[in-house]
Amino acid sequence: MVSSNTAVTQAQPSSSGFRWLQLVMGIVCMAMIANLQYGWTLFVDPIDGAHHWGRASIQFAFTIFVVTETWLVPVEAWFVDKYGPRIVIMFGGVMIALAWVLNSYADSLTVLYAAAVVGGIGAGSVYGTCVGNALKWFPDRRGLAAGATAAGFGAGAAITVVPIANMIASSGYQTAFFDFGIGQGLIVFLLAFFIQKPTVTLPPKKKQLNLPQTKIDFTPPQVLRSPIFWVMYLVFVMVASGGLMAAAQIAPIAHDYKIATTPVSLAGFQMAALTFAISLDRIFDGFGRPFFGWVSDNIGREHTMFIAFGTGALMLLTLSTWGHNPLVFVLATAVYFGVFGEIYSLFPATSGDTFGSKFATTNNGMLYTAKGTAALLVPAASIVAASYGWQAVFVIAVALNATAALMALFVIKPMRRAFIHGNEAAAAETAPGAKTA
């Protein structure tokens, strides 16, 4: 079960600065779509104040966006692998601009929901393309490249959240939607002209023995038929759902613990516990993605997963047991987000190592749909909390993270090596010139 194109062609020198330029442009594009997810919360109350649709109805647009952004990535990625990244990123730039322009004129929930679909398609086009392109340019540093690209998705919101909030306050949310929508979309559209895929397959460094990497480019149908893909998908869903269930409830938990407004002093700063925790969230999340990607490039994907998932379980257990202490709440939350965001660097890198570079965008896009699947499970946290309290939510999240950590070492690691070596041995036996019985 191998694709016909299995040859690895000698490429440009891996030290070439051109591929780093490609990475930087991808990160900037990711920063430009970040506000569609992380900046949305700034608009909810102003929209409700203008139209009185209710927070729940307005927030449903966000759910539509996440599902659309995630589940359509494999389709968009197929176009990338077939026609190249440029046209897909250009399309994404147009769509993200159109989405926020529609939001600026939305006078009904129908228009708001339609804009969420448009924005999801646009953001997914840019996200899947930039991560997939990074995997192709950096087979020797897939973890770092995927992590840095994914970090751009959070960094963009950190840079623009204050200007957006100021514009909403001074000119209204409609103006903020329109102006930032056009600006973000235009930057993505223009950068698309300069983004390209490698003209030849870049070979990974042979000396990295901790990183078993296939020499075969598996097609998407072949990937879907492989058990290792579905095991990776399951672990992705477990970590993402466990993390999202806890992360989505951080504010309610802080209020129920009666520490949300308690002052916390740390490193010369003093803020309310909840505000401090949320502020550190983006910093640690953004730093964690490239950091754990870099670590995985050096010690191996599964070993890094074990460390990250295990640390996540430990931090959730800490929150459950000692989270009533404001300082513990802030620190445990920060560390947790630092190890949670790495799923967006480790799984793309592992996918590229396992299934090859040629169809990396599509194959990683299929794996990325696990985020959408996990998002559908998040409302379960509210149901569990209402019936059994927050302790039960933490028990579930800890169990999911701990199980995922063990599966990374004792299931994914041996299965992935058997998959790579088995298929390469089969390809060698059937290759032209191979000895026959």
What kind of feature is each model-predicted range?
Residues F153-T199:
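Helix-loop-helix hairpin linking two adjacent transmembrane segments in secondary transporters
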Residues A273-T350:
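C-terminal transmembrane helical hairpin of 12-TM major facilitator-type secondary transporters
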Residues W71-L109, S296-E302:
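Conserved MFS/SLC helix-loop-helix module at the cytosolic interface between two early adjacent transmembrane helices
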Residues K197-D217, A418-E429:
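Flexible cytoplasmic inter-helical loops of multi-pass small-molecule transporters
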Residues A31, A99, T110-G124, V237, ...:
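Hydrophobic core of transmembrane alpha-helices in multi-pass small-molecule transporters
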Residues I47-D48, F79-V80, I159-S171, A254-H255, ...:
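Interfacial helix-cap and linker-helix signal at transmembrane-aqueous boundaries
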Residues I47, S125-F138, A146, E342-F355:
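Intracellular juxtamembrane helix-capping segments at the cytosolic ends
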Residues W40-V44, L224-F292:
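Extracytoplasmic gate region of multi-pass secondary transporters
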